[in-house]
Amino acid sequence: MTKPLSSVNLHQLVQQVITEQRHSSILCAPKVIQEGVYDPGILKAVFTAGGPGSGKSYLADVVFGVRTAKDKPFFENASFIGSNGLKYVNSDRFFERELGKLGINPKDLRDIADLPSDELWDIVQSADEPESARNVAKGYLESLRNLYEKGRLGMLIDGTGGKYDKMVREKSLADAMGYDTYMLFVDTSLPVAIERDAKRDRTLGPQLVEEIWQNVQDNKERFKELFGDNFAVVENSVYGPPPQEVIKSLNNFV
């Protein structure tokens, strides 16, 4: 007489049978996986670097063919870039939304920074205040970026490149997740950067613009070494279409 199975052994047997059936169905009726590493944009991360007013977002739109030089910024109305499917990673729109909730016009940020009291500035920008508009915006962006990374979706990571160590960390993390990385460095002269900043809604002022611009310039050669062949510089002191070789290089990359 066969000895009855214990509840534990019975559970293990059922699991084994189910597993074997699953494996058998896969072998007998295999399905073609539609997604892969060769899909446009998949596992591609394009970093931008450039000081205030350099036109990084403008150039990215033109490079990937989602607008001409005369069109309005594409990234204001969408979270992806054209047929390549790259996702924009930029906290600006979230930050401006939080400013709107506070009833603050972005044009007033510089005046707020100059106030004798730091109370209002802390509400807007303080890194130590968890509920500041800037930190809330960064939180939204981090959640969105985590979602993109889990799906290994392609990303355009918009930044100034003013902090070299931060860029090294971000690139290393992307590399570890299997991403191929590229940097688009957008260059302008300091006078042009200051002039353009003065015309922006969120002006930084000449002193801060010069500080950031210099930090970015100091990192330029190091970025070139860090990214190797996947590094392109566009001189954008005069607005215009980027060189065709840059457009071709980036589109071939993604």
Language-model features: locations:
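Conserved GTP-binding G-domain of TRAFAC-class P-loop NTPases and closely related GTPase folds
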Residues: 66, 70, 83, 190-254
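Short hydrophobic/aromatic beta-strand immediately N-terminal to the Walker A/P-loop
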Residues: 45-47
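Conserved substrate/cofactor phosphate-moiety recognition/catalytic segment
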Residues: 63-151, 165
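Conserved lysine of the Walker
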Residues: 56
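The conserved Walker
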Residues: 51-52
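Pre-Walker A adenine-sensing motif
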Residues: 29-39
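Hydrophobic positions on the alpha1 helix immediately C-terminal to the Walker A/P-loop
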Residues: 59
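Conserved phosphate-donor/acceptor-positioning beta-strand/loop module used by diverse small-molecule
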Residues: 162, 175-196
